[in-house]
Every structure is written in C-alpha cells, then in structure tokens.
Amino acid sequence: MVQGVQLPVCLICGLYSQDIQKHRQGFPSSLKLSNGYILPEGKMTPNTLFVGGIDMKVDENEIREFFAKYGSVKEVKIITYRGGICKGYGFVYFSEDVDIQTIVDQPISFKGKKLKLGPAIMKERSSRSVSSPMIGPSQWVNPTPYMYCSCCPPGLAPPSPVFSGGNQYMQPYSYSSPPGIMVPQVPMNYAQTTYAYQYPLPQWCGEQRTRLVNQNFVDCGVQTLLTLM
C-alpha cells in the first residue's frame, strides 16, 4: 500500500476476504478467532453481528437498545423455535458502516452473561429452479433455505429456522434445547403390510386339459374359455 493513497472500501474488503481465505487454506477445519468464535465457510455479511449466549427472556428491543451504542441498529433478529422459545442466539443488523471486528474483540456481557460475538457468515446456495411441463417459468419453485450449525456432531442437526431470502446464515456455536422440549430428529418410517393371495388353479390345468377349438374370450380381466361345438 502506497503511503498517502487511500484505497476504496471495496478493495479493502477484498483484501480482507483474501486474507481470510489464506488462513482457511492453512487450516483443515474452520478458522477459530481469539474469542472462541469458529468462522465457518461462507461469505461475511457486512454490518451484521452474530450474538450468542442470549438469555431466553430477553426480547429484541432490549438487544437493540444495548447495541445502539456501537452504531445505528436497523434490525434485531432473535432465532426461536416454532413455539417462540429463544434458541439463545440472534443477529444484529446495523444501518451504517460498523467495525464488527472491534465489537467482537471486546468482552461484552449482557444481564450478567458473557455474550459470544462474531461476524455473521452467509452461505450461498445454488438456486436451482424446478421446472415441469405443467408449471410455467413464472411458477418455478426455489429450494427452501435452512440454518446450518457448524458445531453439531455428525448425524445430529437441530431444527432450522427458515428465512425469507435465498440465503442462509450459519451459527458457530451449538446450543442445547430447553428442558422439557424434545425435538424429533429422524422422521418415522411406516412399514407397509404385504398381503399374499392364493388363486385357485383353473380346471383345465394338469391332467384335465381341454383342447380348444375356437378363440379365447377375455372379459374384465377374467379368462373364460368358451368351447363351441
């Protein structure tokens, strides 16, 4: 960088993104920051902060007021189960340029609990459209986005909140379900009962064979033999 020359913001972000990619190439797993934040694979969302360790009783307005001292908050999204119970993490969207890394490096506590902060990572999905002869181009169906947890053990995935866009955010921390709540992980399989039917042999089989003189007549799937004299 030449001294006295100010680079555009887009170029600086590009250099920062390349630096992250270099770190990822050196590590077989996801990049882990100094505060324990595991940076998963994906695209970093600007001016968006991941907030983990949220108390179940905290609402979005309290989070908005708390982070307003770091910049103008545009929106706060707390991820919840279908029943409305908080999963313990969420996202803070700032309406202005904010240095997310400066916020992440600070030991921030909220209501006596230390928050787990990190940049929001957005994973791009291929928006393949499903076409059909019965469906026009304007009625194509896009795949449903889902939340992905990079710390869950293999074979175990928590229920995922659905966003209204074509992208998905990934959380770097794993959170257990609240007491008394059980979420089925494997869909139930229903076995189909098989019935065996025995059909009686026709009288003309075996030793009692009848020589057919004329053609056979088929009526409603039942073969009837008519012998014309």
From Swiss-Prot:
GO cellular component, one term: cytoplasm
GO biological process: 3'-UTR-mediated mRNA stabilization; germ-line cyst formation; negative regulation of miRNA-mediated gene silencing; oogenesis; positive regulation of gene expression; positive regulation of translational initiation; spermatogenesis
A Pfam family it matches: RRM_1
Domain DAZ positions: 172-198
UniProt keyword terms in alphabetical order: Activator, Cytoplasm, Developmental protein, Differentiation, Oogenesis, RNA-binding, Spermatogenesis, Translation regulation
Substitution effect: residue 91 to A: Abolishes the RNA-binding activity
Organism: Danio rerio (Zebrafish)
UniProt cross-references to InterPro entries, sorted A to Z: DAZ_dom, DAZ_RRM_vert, Nucleotide-bd_a/b_plait_sf, RBD_domain_sf, RRM_dom
Tissues in which the protein is found: Testis and ovary specific. In ovary, it is localized in the cortex of oocytes. At the onset of embryogenesis, maternal product is located at the vegetal pole, before migrating toward blastomeres through cytoplasmic streams as early embryogenesis proceededs.
Top-rank taxon, per record: Eukaryota
One MF term in the entry's GO annotations: RNA binding
Protein name, as recorded: Deleted in azoospermia-like
Subcellular location: Cytoplasm
UniProt free text on domains: The DAZ domain is essential for the translation activation activity.
Annotated S-S bridges: none
Residue stretches making up the RRM domain: 47-128
Family (UniProt): Belongs to the RRM DAZ family.
Primary residence: cytoplasm
Function comment: RNA-binding protein involved in gametogenesis in both males and females. Acts by binding to the 3'-UTR of mRNA, specifically recognizing GUU triplets, and promoting the translation of key transcripts. Establishes oocyte polarity through interaction with Bucky ball (BUC). Interacts with Bucky ball (BUC) mRNA to mediate Balbiani body formation and oocyte polarity during early oogenesis.
